[in-house]
């Protein structure tokens, strides 16, 4: 177990959780950089968005017990490596619902937020963040999210709406911490 303060952001694809996470780093929270086996997107920064690794590396580290939490989403691994956490630092992290459940057990000093956004805004964000969006992939992510995020609003501490004003959403999170 860790005594670090942790803000956990959970939200569907296109909800703006990564943009909120980025803004929270300007307010004294350090981003936990997760590992993933997914392909790099146009707007990704290696070592800042994620640590990009292959599936073999990921599976070996899982088998060695080196991930605090991990999940498979759309056929790709995502997880937080033990080496990513240092004692005494306050963190912010974006995760899926299974990651949220794992982290709440490891970090009892956490505050969790579901980042909610209307579907039109979500879709436009997803389409605009990639240079050549693959509509089939985006639709699959949305369908998967429909199932995966079912009932998450009842499990988190707060629900934050992020339809049009990210600074307003960030301020609500900061007021709640």
What are these model-predicted stretches?
Residues 1-4:
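Phosphate-binding P-loop
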Residues 9:
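Hydrophobic anchor at the beta1->P-loop junction of P-loop NTPases
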Residues 12:
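P-loop (Walker A) phosphate-binding loop of NTP-binding proteins
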Residues 17-18:
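Walker A/P-loop
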Residues 26-34:
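Post-Walker A helix-loop "phosphate-sensing" segment adjacent to the P-loop in P-loop NTPases
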Residues 36-91:
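ATP-dependent small-molecule kinase phosphotransfer cores
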Residues 92-96, 106-127:
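Conserved phosphate-donor/acceptor-positioning beta-strand/loop module used by diverse small-molecule
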Residues 132-177:
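Small-molecule kinase domains that catalyze NTP-dependent phosphoryl transfer to phosphate-bearing small molecules
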């Amino acid at each position: 177990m860790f005594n670090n303060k942790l803000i956990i952001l959970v939200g569907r694809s296109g909800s703006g959780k990564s943009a909120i996470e980025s803004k929270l780093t300007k307010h004294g929270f350090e981003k936990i950089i997760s590992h993933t086996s997914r392909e790099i997107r146009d707007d990704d920064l290696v070592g800042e968005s994620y640590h990009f690794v292959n599936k073999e590396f990921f599976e070996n580290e899982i088998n060695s017990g080196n991930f605090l939490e991990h999940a498979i989403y759309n056929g790709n691994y995502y997880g937080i490596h033990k080496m990513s956490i240092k004692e005494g630092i306050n963190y912010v992290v974006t995760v899926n619902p299974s990651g949220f459940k794992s982290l709440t057990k490891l970090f009892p000093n956490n505050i969790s937020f579901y980042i909610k956004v209307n579907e039109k805004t979500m879709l436009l964000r997803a389409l605009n963040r990639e240079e050549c969006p693959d509509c089939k992939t985006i639709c699959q992510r949305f369908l998967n999210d429909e199932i995966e995020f079912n009932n998450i609003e009842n499990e988190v501490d707060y629900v934050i709406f992020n339809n049009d004003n990210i600074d307003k959403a960030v301020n609500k999170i900061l007021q709640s911490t």
